[in-house]
Amino acid sequence: MIMTESRAVIHLEPPAETSQEQADLLIVKVEEEDCSWMQGYNRPVLETFYQRFKHFQYHEAAGPRDALSQLRVLCCEWLRPELHTKEQILELLVLEQFLTILPEEFQAWVREHHPESGEEAVAVIESIQRELEERRQQIATSPEVLPQKMVPPGATQESFSHQCLPVEAQPERESQNLLEENALPVLQVSSVPLKDSQELTDSLLSDGPQKLVKTEDVADVAVSFILEEWAHLDQSQKSLGRDSRKEDCESTTPVDYEPKEGNLEFTVQQVSDAADPHWVAAERTEKNGVQRPESGEVSDLKDMVPRWQVNPTSGNPRQKRPLRSGPDVNRKQKSNGERGHRCGDCGKFFLQASNFIQHRRIHTGEKPFKCGECGKSYNQRVHLTQHQRVHTGEKPYKCQVCGKAFRVSSHLVQHHSVHSGERPYGCNECGKSFGRHSHLIEHLKRHFREKSQRCSDRRSKNTKLNIKQIPGLSEADLELSGEVQRNACQAEGHSEGCEHQDGQQGVVMKETLGQSSSKRTDCNEFSYVHKKSSPGERPHQCNECGKSFIQSAHLIQHRRIHTGEKPFRCEECGKSYNQRVHLTQHHRVHTGEKPYACHLCGKAFRVRSHLVQHQSVHSRERPFKCNECGKGFGRRSHLAGHLRLHSRDKSHQCHECGEIFFQYVSLLEHQVLHVGQKSEKNGICEEAYSWNLTVIKDKKLELQEQPYQCDSCGKAFSYSSDLIQHYRTHSAEKPQKCDACRDSTCQCPHIKQQQKSCPSGKSHQCNECGRGFSLKSHLSQHQRIHTGEKPLQCKECGMSFSWSCSLFKHLRSHERTDP
């Protein structure tokens, strides 16, 4: 509905006791306003779906099954489970039940505001209660306010014309001011002498079945009158009432407004405060409509929208008094055609009062929602609800792919990108994509640091001469110099606020011209990196090793390396870690969770980096290349090992075959191949040993630390797995046998792989005997029993064997027989 300035003038026929002359004095001025400010909200649509679901009848369906299916469809249209979360659906159900249990005088009022949450509904009711309480207090403290409001203080005793003048007869300027300032239906009394107007006031106060003797009764009557009338209003009138409450202030007359003689105005609320409500109600029921003098149309008495504001007179102008006063509240006026709440601190605009109240807590620091467990406070109830799940352990948002649960729905959305491989956040500079927005922000900071470094290098070359020292240089030349410098930066794609443009020349120019250096504008939200520190600067430095970091959080994590602090402890096994992400990865060892699955072969991993390394197996990609020989590798660790070949450190070399090793232990393991050669003297133990497995193991024990010691015999081991296996010799537990050779004392790599794998997961089965194996390689070795294959041969005697462990045992027999 388009806002118009039309006004309807309605005669009110008084009771039989009043004279026809007094009936001609009452004129109602109604302003038609726009009632579409709530359009576009989802709440009215949801209300429609709710009413359809609530009022569905059984006879509307073809049968019980059809009725049940239609109810399900209507319920889904109302609750929208595919769009709304579980919390939103619960909030909607609680809101509908809350509106149902409200008193009847509040239900219609609150529903017309279309609250979207229980908090908004409570805010509307509290606002109504505060306004009603203010009206009671105002009437209780000023009993004489009613007669004074109805008589203008500046009126004279002159005799006026007794003719009823329509509102259109008023001067144009005064009519326009009233339309703009007073969005109220006004009872206007024209051409009434002061004496007659006083008689009219006394008549209104005295007529009716009962007389008002207490000001408290007047306030109660006003409240009951308002709530009764609200239920009988049409949509446009209710919207008009909402707009007046949304403005939260009383109507005022402009300061320059001076009423003409014979022009006495007072609002409907003054009549409802002064007159008996039963008279008003009876008059409404008896008179269904009254004649408009200019159009002849019939209008109901209920078209008068009850208001609580008072229309002041020229003798006592009053300013608007907002119900929620404060310097931070700045509302948009009706002249702009907008209604809402604007924050006085940051300028943000909100249509709903509840959103504005939540936003104000950011500036005030108010946190009304407190956790009863730990005492933490939050400014929104939803944040408290999410925090309480930390204490209860509730994780309602579960991934349907891997079963992982989360406390917050946004974390589940981010987790879905792990399975889908989606990277929606792309960098406009290099085209690289990321799965999370925070990762994109960190990546963009690197680009800005690179640009800052280029600007710094360019500035160091071009700003060695201070242009302020050049004699005869005018202000125009300074401006031209700065413009040239800015164009050079813009040509390279730098932001407007880069340090190069506001470098030494720019500062000198601004100081010379007396301009402020605060006019720097940035074209990107991440350009604060320029302002925060100089290009390439790492302000956070470690006092122990001197390493620098850009962010203080990284420095805190780094210091834990020196202090040995490990604040993140596993409750299952007691292990501690210095970073939370490491603890999260460790938890997956206990839970068996492997959220990172390969979409090609289905293999899952606990850590994302392991999945990335695994994917190079399918793609045959070798991103890590050697700069010396050009050889590529799929893993960085493999490249690091290869680079040692090109280094000068080649001290560990096999004297038999010439192969080079960078670790002495690797050389010892390699020399097992040469066990058939003559024995050498052990330089570490000063004893003569043959090059067999015993010597190699003893040398490894001497070269390495042995922190794991047996409590029974005192034997020490380098690895915890060796200690666990040693414990079996003291206990009655039988050690696990090798799947290939069925030997419990076997130390070949097969038994180690077998111990790591799950015993129950033997997916590879032998077709001959039905025996199962956890690894396919074990099955291949086992099948040599049925086929009789012996691929391993002794070079000394030519004897063949099926397994490598059997060959090692045979080689030891040759060592004992050697002289």
Curated annotation (Swiss-Prot):
One example GO MF annotation: zinc ion binding
Quick one: a GO cellular component term? Answer: nucleus
Q: What is its main location?
A: nucleus
Does this entry carry the keyword Isomerase? Answer: no
Compartments reported by the entry: Nucleus
Q: Where is the composition biased (Basic and acidic residues)?
A: 240-249, 329-340
User: Residue ranges of the C2H2-type zinc fingers?
Assistant: 341-363, 369-391, 397-419, 425-447, 540-562, 568-590, 596-618, 624-646, 652-674, 708-730, 764-786, 792-814
Q: Which CDD domains match?
A: KRAB_A-box, SCAN
Q: Which residues form the KRAB domain?
A: 216-287
- What keywords tag this UniProt record? DNA-binding, Isopeptide bond, Metal-binding, Nucleus, Repeat, Transcription, Transcription regulation, Ubl conjugation, Zinc, Zinc-finger
Q: Which InterPro entries match?
A: KRAB, KRAB_dom_sf, SCAN_dom, SCAN_sf, Znf_C2H2_sf, Znf_C2H2_type
In this chain the SCAN box domain maps to 51-132
Pfam families assigned: KRAB (PF01352), SCAN (PF02023), zf-C2H2 (PF00096)
Q: Locate the cross-link: Glycyl lysine isopeptide (Lys-Gly) (interchain with G-Cter in SUMO2).
A: K214, K246, K302, K700, K776
Determine if Transcription is one of this entry's keywords.
yes
- Tell me the protein family, please: Belongs to the krueppel C2H2-type zinc-finger protein family.
Q: Please describe what this protein does.
A: May be involved in transcriptional regulation.
Protein name per the record:
Zinc finger protein with KRAB and SCAN domains 5
The protein's organism comes out as Mus musculus
Taxonomy-wise, where does this protein's organism fall, top ranks first?
Eukaryota, Metazoa, Chordata, Craniata, Vertebrata
Instruction: State the gene name recorded for this protein.
Output: Zkscan5
